[in-house]
Amino acid sequence: MKKIIRRFLLPGLAVLATGIALSQDRSRKGDTRKYALVPVAKVESTRPPSLEARRFGPDKLIDGKLPANGWRSTWTAWYKDNPTLTFDLGSEKTIGVIRIFFQPWDRSDELAQVKVEVSRDGVNYVDFNTYAGFVSERGEGAWAEMDLRQIKARFFRLSPKFQGWGHLWGEVEFWGIKK
């Protein structure tokens, strides 16, 4: 048993800790990209927010404020409600990173995946990538970071999938690449 722990568990925990530490840092060794936060002109959701959080529409995702008290101050989509959120940046931008501040409630891995689609005109979307592996302490907020490398688009459509209680999102950020 000790052999298994030394061989698999300890290296796995080291990789996980490194990933968490790097997820909050914009600069990485070998990555020469310089970032700037890009304002979002408009955000829309295919479904309204749920229950008591109904008063917090998707515009709460781009107000620059992290939630203070869980689902009572976040954009929330409840159990089995997988909406699509469309973000309009106002004009074409070169985006390197998208970050989502999420709060797991029922399971630490509640945010199972996020599908990212991009468009230049808001009509014709192209699948860009699907990101997974977001984990945080239950009841604690964390940033899910998606590296887009360098994609130029005006519209970004995010389609999250849950595996648990639902979606509690406090903020979504788009980080553009400076020239």
Model feature map: region roles:
Residues 159-165:
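Short beta-strand-plus-loop segments that form exposed binding edges in beta-rich domains
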Residues 24-92, 103-110, 120, 127-139, ...:
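Disordered, acidic Ser/Thr/Pro-rich linker "stalks" and the adjacent N-terminal cap
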Residues 142-154:
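Short, surface-exposed tryptophan/glycine-enriched loops
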Residues 114-116:
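Short beta-strand elements bearing conserved aromatic residues within extracellular beta-rich modules
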Residues 94-105, 158:
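A short beta-strand element within beta-rich, extracytoplasmic domains
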Residues 13-22:
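Hydrophobic h-region of N-terminal signal peptides that target proteins for export
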Residues 2-9:
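Bacterial N-terminal signal peptides that target proteins for export
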